[in-house]
Amino acid sequence: PMPSVNIQLFGEDENGIGEIVARGPNVMMGYLNQPEETAEVLKDGWFYTGDLGRFDAHGNLYITGRKKNVIVMKNGKNIFPEEIEEKISRLPYAAECLVFAREKHNDLVLWTKIVYPEDYLKEKNWTVDQLAEQVRMDLGAINDAMPKYKHINHFILSHEPMIKTTTQKIKRIPEIEKINAQQDSELWYNCTM
Protein backbone atom coordinates (compact mmCIF):
# COMPACT_ATOMS: atom_id res chain seq x y z
CA PRO A 1 0.00 0.00 0.00
CA MET A 2 0.87 3.64 -0.24
CA PRO A 3 2.52 5.35 2.74
CA SER A 4 0.04 6.11 5.54
CA VAL A 5 -2.55 3.72 4.06
CA ASN A 6 -3.38 0.54 5.95
CA ILE A 7 -4.94 -2.47 4.27
CA GLN A 8 -6.28 -5.49 6.11
CA LEU A 9 -8.62 -8.40 5.55
CA PHE A 10 -11.83 -8.69 7.54
CA GLY A 11 -13.63 -11.97 8.19
CA GLU A 12 -10.98 -14.26 6.72
CA ASP A 13 -12.05 -17.82 5.90
CA GLU A 14 -9.99 -21.00 6.25
CA ASN A 15 -8.19 -20.12 2.99
CA GLY A 16 -7.17 -16.68 4.24
CA ILE A 17 -9.68 -14.89 2.00
CA GLY A 18 -11.51 -11.94 3.51
CA GLU A 19 -13.01 -8.59 2.64
CA ILE A 20 -10.40 -5.96 1.83
CA VAL A 21 -10.63 -2.97 4.17
CA ALA A 22 -8.52 0.19 3.97
CA ARG A 23 -7.94 3.35 5.96
CA GLY A 24 -5.78 6.39 5.46
CA PRO A 25 -5.93 10.08 4.62
CA ASN A 26 -6.63 9.44 0.94
CA VAL A 27 -9.38 6.85 1.49
CA MET A 28 -12.88 8.14 0.82
CA MET A 29 -14.71 9.95 3.59
CA GLY A 30 -18.16 8.82 2.49
CA TYR A 31 -20.84 9.11 -0.16
CA LEU A 32 -22.10 12.66 -0.68
CA ASN A 33 -25.49 13.17 1.01
CA GLN A 34 -25.92 9.40 1.49
CA PRO A 35 -25.41 8.71 5.22
CA GLU A 36 -26.96 5.20 5.17
CA GLU A 37 -24.75 4.02 2.31
CA THR A 38 -21.72 5.61 3.98
CA ALA A 39 -22.49 3.81 7.26
CA GLU A 40 -22.56 0.48 5.39
CA VAL A 41 -19.02 0.86 4.02
CA LEU A 42 -17.24 3.03 6.63
CA LYS A 43 -16.87 1.43 10.06
CA ASP A 44 -14.45 2.53 12.78
CA GLY A 45 -12.44 4.48 10.21
CA TRP A 46 -12.11 1.50 7.85
CA PHE A 47 -13.49 1.50 4.30
CA TYR A 48 -15.05 -1.88 3.48
CA THR A 49 -14.41 -2.21 -0.25
CA GLY A 50 -16.70 -5.14 -1.06
CA ASP A 51 -13.69 -6.79 -2.72
CA LEU A 52 -12.37 -10.11 -1.45
CA GLY A 53 -8.71 -10.94 -1.38
CA ARG A 54 -5.83 -12.73 0.28
CA PHE A 55 -2.23 -11.94 1.14
CA ASP A 56 0.60 -14.21 0.02
CA ALA A 57 3.65 -15.04 2.14
CA HIS A 58 5.40 -11.87 0.90
CA GLY A 59 2.54 -9.56 1.84
CA ASN A 60 1.26 -9.10 -1.72
CA LEU A 61 -2.50 -8.65 -1.95
CA TYR A 62 -4.48 -10.70 -4.48
CA ILE A 63 -8.07 -9.75 -5.25
CA THR A 64 -10.16 -12.90 -5.60
CA GLY A 65 -13.61 -11.48 -6.35
CA ARG A 66 -16.52 -9.41 -5.10
CA LYS A 67 -18.23 -10.19 -1.81
CA LYS A 68 -21.68 -9.88 -3.41
CA ASN A 69 -20.77 -12.46 -6.10
CA VAL A 70 -19.70 -15.29 -3.77
CA ILE A 71 -21.61 -18.54 -4.29
CA VAL A 72 -22.07 -20.44 -1.02
CA MET A 73 -22.56 -24.12 -1.77
CA LYS A 74 -24.78 -26.38 0.39
CA ASN A 75 -21.63 -27.86 1.98
CA GLY A 76 -20.65 -24.35 3.15
CA LYS A 77 -17.80 -23.98 0.66
CA ASN A 78 -17.39 -20.56 -0.94
CA ILE A 79 -16.88 -20.25 -4.67
CA PHE A 80 -15.58 -17.06 -6.21
CA PRO A 81 -17.00 -17.13 -9.75
CA GLU A 82 -14.40 -14.65 -11.01
CA GLU A 83 -11.66 -17.21 -10.29
CA ILE A 84 -13.29 -19.76 -12.62
CA GLU A 85 -14.35 -17.12 -15.16
CA GLU A 86 -10.73 -16.02 -15.46
CA LYS A 87 -9.75 -19.55 -16.50
CA ILE A 88 -12.64 -19.90 -18.96
CA SER A 89 -11.97 -16.48 -20.49
CA ARG A 90 -8.56 -17.74 -21.67
CA LEU A 91 -10.25 -20.15 -24.08
CA PRO A 92 -10.00 -18.85 -27.66
CA TYR A 93 -13.75 -18.94 -28.30
CA ALA A 94 -14.86 -17.39 -24.98
CA ALA A 95 -15.65 -13.76 -25.82
CA GLU A 96 -17.66 -13.54 -22.58
CA CYS A 97 -18.37 -15.95 -19.75
CA LEU A 98 -20.38 -16.05 -16.56
CA VAL A 99 -20.28 -18.65 -13.77
CA PHE A 100 -23.38 -19.13 -11.61
CA ALA A 101 -25.15 -21.78 -9.54
CA ARG A 102 -28.53 -23.43 -10.04
CA GLU A 103 -30.44 -25.76 -7.75
CA LYS A 104 -30.50 -29.42 -8.75
CA HIS A 105 -31.75 -32.30 -6.60
CA ASN A 106 -31.59 -30.25 -3.38
CA ASP A 107 -28.04 -29.12 -4.10
CA LEU A 108 -26.34 -26.34 -6.04
CA VAL A 109 -24.42 -27.09 -9.21
CA LEU A 110 -22.22 -24.75 -11.19
CA TRP A 111 -23.02 -23.59 -14.69
CA THR A 112 -21.23 -21.32 -17.08
CA LYS A 113 -22.58 -19.34 -19.98
CA ILE A 114 -20.06 -18.83 -22.75
CA VAL A 115 -20.61 -16.31 -25.52
CA TYR A 116 -18.61 -17.14 -28.62
CA PRO A 117 -17.97 -14.78 -31.56
CA GLU A 118 -20.43 -15.58 -34.33
CA ASP A 119 -17.68 -15.90 -36.92
CA TYR A 120 -15.69 -18.36 -34.76
CA LEU A 121 -17.71 -21.30 -36.11
CA LYS A 122 -17.18 -20.12 -39.70
CA GLU A 123 -13.43 -19.71 -39.17
CA LYS A 124 -13.16 -23.24 -37.76
CA ASN A 125 -15.75 -24.65 -40.17
CA TRP A 126 -17.52 -26.11 -37.12
CA THR A 127 -21.10 -26.71 -36.12
CA VAL A 128 -22.34 -25.62 -32.70
CA ASP A 129 -22.20 -29.29 -31.64
CA GLN A 130 -18.51 -29.45 -32.59
CA LEU A 131 -17.88 -26.32 -30.53
CA ALA A 132 -19.79 -27.91 -27.64
CA GLU A 133 -17.49 -30.95 -27.79
CA GLN A 134 -14.44 -28.67 -27.62
CA VAL A 135 -15.97 -26.75 -24.71
CA ARG A 136 -16.73 -30.03 -22.92
CA MET A 137 -13.06 -31.09 -23.26
CA ASP A 138 -11.75 -27.68 -22.18
CA LEU A 139 -14.07 -27.46 -19.17
CA GLY A 140 -13.03 -31.00 -18.26
CA ALA A 141 -9.40 -29.87 -18.17
CA ILE A 142 -10.33 -26.80 -16.09
CA ASN A 143 -12.36 -29.00 -13.72
CA ASP A 144 -9.46 -31.45 -13.36
CA ALA A 145 -7.28 -28.62 -12.01
CA MET A 146 -9.81 -27.60 -9.33
CA PRO A 147 -11.41 -29.20 -6.27
CA LYS A 148 -14.61 -31.13 -7.03
CA TYR A 149 -16.91 -28.57 -5.38
CA LYS A 150 -15.73 -25.98 -7.94
CA HIS A 151 -16.46 -28.14 -10.99
CA ILE A 152 -18.62 -26.74 -13.77
CA ASN A 153 -21.43 -29.25 -14.39
CA HIS A 154 -23.32 -27.59 -17.24
CA PHE A 155 -22.70 -24.94 -19.85
CA ILE A 156 -24.71 -22.74 -22.16
CA LEU A 157 -23.45 -21.58 -25.54
CA SER A 158 -24.63 -18.39 -27.18
CA HIS A 159 -23.44 -15.87 -29.71
CA GLU A 160 -25.72 -13.16 -28.26
CA PRO A 161 -23.87 -10.69 -26.00
CA MET A 162 -24.74 -10.70 -22.31
CA ILE A 163 -26.46 -7.82 -20.52
CA LYS A 164 -23.81 -5.23 -19.63
CA THR A 165 -23.31 -1.92 -17.86
CA THR A 166 -22.23 1.19 -19.73
CA THR A 167 -18.65 0.27 -18.76
CA GLN A 168 -19.12 -3.15 -20.45
CA LYS A 169 -19.16 -5.22 -17.25
CA ILE A 170 -21.61 -8.11 -17.26
CA LYS A 171 -24.68 -7.42 -15.13
CA ARG A 172 -24.58 -10.70 -13.21
CA ILE A 173 -28.01 -10.65 -11.57
CA PRO A 174 -30.05 -9.57 -14.63
CA GLU A 175 -28.15 -12.05 -16.83
CA ILE A 176 -28.72 -14.93 -14.39
CA GLU A 177 -32.41 -13.97 -14.08
CA LYS A 178 -32.67 -14.01 -17.89
CA ILE A 179 -31.08 -17.47 -18.02
CA ASN A 180 -33.32 -18.82 -15.25
CA ALA A 181 -36.43 -17.48 -17.02
CA GLN A 182 -35.58 -19.45 -20.16
CA GLN A 183 -36.60 -23.05 -20.62
CA ASP A 184 -33.93 -25.63 -21.29
CA SER A 185 -32.50 -25.03 -24.70
CA GLU A 186 -30.71 -27.14 -27.27
CA LEU A 187 -27.68 -24.96 -26.50
CA TRP A 188 -27.57 -26.09 -22.84
CA TYR A 189 -25.09 -28.92 -22.31
CA ASN A 190 -23.81 -31.27 -19.62
CA CYS A 191 -20.07 -31.26 -19.09
CA THR A 192 -20.04 -35.05 -19.18
CA MET A 193 -21.72 -37.29 -21.72
Residue ranges of predicted features:
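Glycine-centered tight turns that cap/initiate beta-strands
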Residues: 4, 93-96, 151
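Short secondary-structure edge/capping micro-motifs at helix/strand boundaries
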Residues: 37-38
